[in-house]
Structure formats: C-alpha cells, structure tokens
UniProtKB/Swiss-Prot annotation:
Disulfide bonds: none annotated. PANTHER family: TRANSDUCIN-LIKE ENHANCER PROTEIN (PTHR10814), TRANSDUCIN-LIKE ENHANCER PROTEIN 4 (PTHR10814:SF31). This is TLE family member 5. Residues 170-197 are annotated as: Disordered. It holds the Pfam family TLE_N. The keyword Amino-acid biosynthesis does not apply. Residues 166-197 are annotated as: CCN domain. Homooligomer and heterooligomer with other family members. Binds TCF7 and the NF-kappa-B subunit RELA. Interacts with PHF12. Interacts (via Q domain) with SIX3. Interacts with SIX6. The gene is Tle5. Belongs to the WD repeat Groucho/TLE family. Residues 175-197 have a biased composition (Basic and acidic residues). Ubiquitously expressed in developing embryos by midgestation, a wide expression is conserved in adult. In mouse, abundantly expressed in muscle, heart and brain. It comes from the Eukaryota. It comes from Mus musculus (Mouse). GO terms for molecular function: transcription corepressor activity.
Length: 197
C-alpha cells in the first residue's frame, strides 16, 4: 500500500521541477538571443563601416594610380625634352669659340646639379605664383601671407599634386615662350618683307 503512494508523491513533484527548468531555460535563451542580437547589430555596423572605408580606399587608389600614371608620362616627356636639348647643345657647341665652349660646358654641368632643397624651393615658388594667379582670377582681396602659409580658400597641396601643378605650369610657360617666339618670328618676317620692298 505504501509503495504506490510514494511513487505517486514522487511523480507529483516532477511537473513543478520540469516547469521551473523550462522557464529558466527560456529566460536564458532569451538573454542569449538578445546578447547575440546586440553583437550582430554591432558587427553589422562595423561591417558597414569597413565597406565604406574599403570604397574610400579604392577611390584613393584610383586617384593615386591616375596621379602616378600622369607623373610617369610627364617624367618620360621631360626626359625626352632633356635629351633633345642636350642634342641641340652638342650640335651648337662646336660653333662657339674655345673660351665660350668651356663656359657653356660649365654652365651645363652646373644646371645638372639640382639639389632637393632647390627643387622644393622652386616648387613652392611656382605654387605660390599659381595660387596668387587663381586668387586674382577670382577677384578676392589679397593680403600678404607668411612664408609657407597657404590661403584658407585653397585646398592643401600634396607633394604629388605639387609636382603635377609644377609640370602644368612648366608646360604653360613653355607654350607662352613658343607663342612669343612665333610672334617675334612673324614680326621679323614682316620687317624683312618691308625691307625687301
């Protein structure tokens, strides 16, 4: 008689224990789900940030690649110009007197010895002149600037863009000299024509 009662009493405690562990497990699962959801949200934000940085890096890579390609083209162009000018100097040099030949050779050797500080100074002067011309074109009031200080309205210039600007300025100067020489040649031809008349 006692055996069935003890078995019945033991079975009556099982649903309460089972109910308690199920509720506790659900709470733990809910907490873990919320934690995982917060981690997922944080990782998603970080992934979006990395994707944005990746696209920005790709944009910078394309920009630097184009700049590098342009500098490479400009370097080959300047090397070809130097080679042609050296050829012209070599052709003209024998027609000079011995004294003038030595002077010209010395001047050519001195011209080849360009130091980095001299190059930086030349680039800085060219950029300042270019920026002043831009300010004058915009009709902005000009105030004297300390050495090395750039106008606030103009973006900061990096070394690569500085070289590109310098090369662009050099090409403009070269073109203006060619135009001037061509104009002088036209005036000489007109003078010769008037003299022949």
């Amino acid at each position: 008689m006692m055996f069935p009662q003890s078995r019945h009493s033991g079975s009556s405690h099982l649903p309460q224990q089972l109910k308690f562990t199920t509720s506790d497990s659900c709470d733990r699962i809910k907490d873990e789900f919320q934690l995982l959801q917060a981690q997922y949200h944080s990782l998603k934000l970080e992934c979006d940030k990395l994707a944005s940085e990746k696209s920005e890096m790709q944009r910078h890579y394309v920009m630097y690649y184009e700049m590098s390609y342009g500098l490479n083209i400009e370097m080959h162009k300047q090397a070809e110009i130097v080679k042609r000018l050296n050829g012209i100097c070599a052709q003209v040099l024998p027609y000079l007197s011995q004294e003038h030949q030595q002077q010209v050779l010395g001047a050519i050797e001195r011209a080849k010895q360009v130091t980095a500080p001299e190059l930086n100074s030349i680039i800085r002067q060219q950029l300042q002149a270019h920026q002043l011309s831009q300010l004058q074109a915009l009709a902005l009031p000009l105030t004297p600037l300390p050495v090395g200080l750039q106008p606030p309205s103009l973006p900061a210039v990096s070394a690569g863009t500085g070289l590109l600007s310098l090369s662009a300025l050099g090409s403009q100067t070269h073109l203006s000299k060619e135009d001037k020489n061509g104009h002088d040649g036209d005036t000489h031809q007109e003078d010769d024509g008037e003299k022949s008349d």
